[in-house]
Amino acid sequence: MSALPLATDYARIFLDDVPLIDLRAPIEFKEGAFPCSTNLPLMTDDERAQVGTCFKQQGQAAAIALGHQLVGGAVRAERLEGWLAQLRRQPDAVLYCFRGGLRSQTVQQWLHEAGVTRPRIAGGYKDLRRFLIDTLDGAAAECQWTVLTGMTGSGKTHMLAEVAQALDLEGHAHHRGSSFGQLPGGQPSNINFENNLAIELLKRRHQGEQAFVVEDESRLIGRCCLPNPLFDAMSQAPLVVVEVPQEERAEQIRQDYVHDLWLRYQAMFGAEEGWPLFAAYLTDALARLKRRLGDQAHRELDTLMQSALAEQASSGDTSLHLAWITLLLTRYYDPMYLYQLGNKRERIIFQGDKQACLDFFAKQRA
């Protein structure tokens, strides 16, 4: 087995989007993998668990023997055909298991005996993951970071779409970063969030980019946690403050979190099934703020929200949502933002309206 080829240029694998065949069990794949990987496991979750138990109780030799017993005969033939079929679709695919050990060595040998020789990752998933963590850490330490901040509803995410050097953290997290930030479809695992972020940074730095603009985020974007080195770099980075009137911000929130999000629920689930899910999303998001708002303020806001939802369900009109949105900005989000900004004013390098901030970023890049 040792004479068969190894893949060791991890940067090139990610830069070129080399297809990967992940031979780990489905439970391992679900915890974290890579965007170009396909899970075609050597063993099922149950088979892996049996082999693991055998290893603990009887040692390596017995565990290997059990593995060959479980994945032998017709099972081996069926799985081998699955790997061969994938390699017919993606003939340049590379194999990996967790550590580059027996699982990937075994499959590599079986494929070789079937007439197909493909490299395996020398250190497996563990080495690829370490490479991407180091990539993130290096980017956090070596790149120039600028943070775009502004009151809730300022349209910062929309602005970043017009900034060439923007890095969309919320896009990678599939979450808008507030109590109302949950999006239909759920979030990636934290490992996948980090992996995808690292790969984007690797590719962009390979193209020569060294300066990035990110939106002001807390450590957690939904359930996705920013890597400590990146969060620390953002916490010390210069700030650009976008200034938007409250009326305009309330309208932006209505558009993003009511009108557009309802369309996403409708597209994903259909109108009949999607409506109660959408209404529950808004209601639950407000409920998560109850402790900070206090019972009375929460009741007042919830009453306004339920009236707005009833009108929307009846007529399709979403304008009543502006009442609770404006009150929530006034009572909660705006005071919280002003307090937080007061603790970091010394980091502000520019502030102005949307166009002024976009012009600043364009000049910064030039």
UniProtKB/Swiss-Prot annotation:
GO biological process, one term: tRNA wobble uridine modification
Keyword match Transferase: yes
Assembly and oligomerization: Monomer.
Enzyme class, spelled out: transferase
Swiss-Prot/TrEMBL keywords: Selenium, Transferase
Family the UniProt entry places it in: Belongs to the SelU family.
Full protein name: tRNA 2-selenouridine synthase
Gene Ontology molecular functions: transferase activity, transferring alkyl or aryl (other than methyl) groups; tRNA 2-selenouridine synthase activity
Annotated EC: 2.9.1.3
Function statement: Involved in the post-transcriptional modification of the uridine at the wobble position (U34) of tRNA(Lys), tRNA(Glu) and tRNA(Gln). Catalyzes the conversion of 2-thiouridine (S2U-RNA) to 2-selenouridine (Se2U-RNA). Acts in a two-step process involving geranylation of 2-thiouridine (S2U) to S-geranyl-2-thiouridine (geS2U) and subsequent selenation of the latter derivative to 2-selenouridine (Se2U) in the tRNA chain.
Keyword Transferase: yes
Naturally occurring in which organism (per UniProt): Aeromonas hydrophila subsp. hydrophila (strain ATCC 7966 / DSM 30187 / BCRC 13018 / CCUG 14551 / JCM 1027 / KCTC 2358 / NCIMB 9240 / NCTC 8049)
Gene3D superfamilies referenced in this protein's UniProt entry, alphabetically: Rhodanese-like domain
Domain Rhodanese: 14-137
Active site (record annotation): C97 (s-selanylcysteine intermediate)
Catalytic reaction annotation: 5-methylaminomethyl-2-thiouridine(34) in tRNA + selenophosphate + (2E)-geranyl diphosphate + H2O + H(+) = 5-methylaminomethyl-2-selenouridine(34) in tRNA + (2E)-thiogeraniol + phosphate + diphosphate; 5-methylaminomethyl-2-thiouridine(34) in tRNA + (2E)-geranyl diphosphate = 5-methylaminomethyl-S-(2E)-geranyl-thiouridine(34) in tRNA + diphosphate; 5-methylaminomethyl-S-(2E)-geranyl-thiouridine(34) in tRNA + selenophosphate + H(+) = 5-methylaminomethyl-2-(Se-phospho)selenouridine(34) in tRNA + (2E)-thiogeraniol; 5-methylaminomethyl-2-(Se-phospho)selenouridine(34) in tRNA + H2O = 5-methylaminomethyl-2-selenouridine(34) in tRNA + phosphate
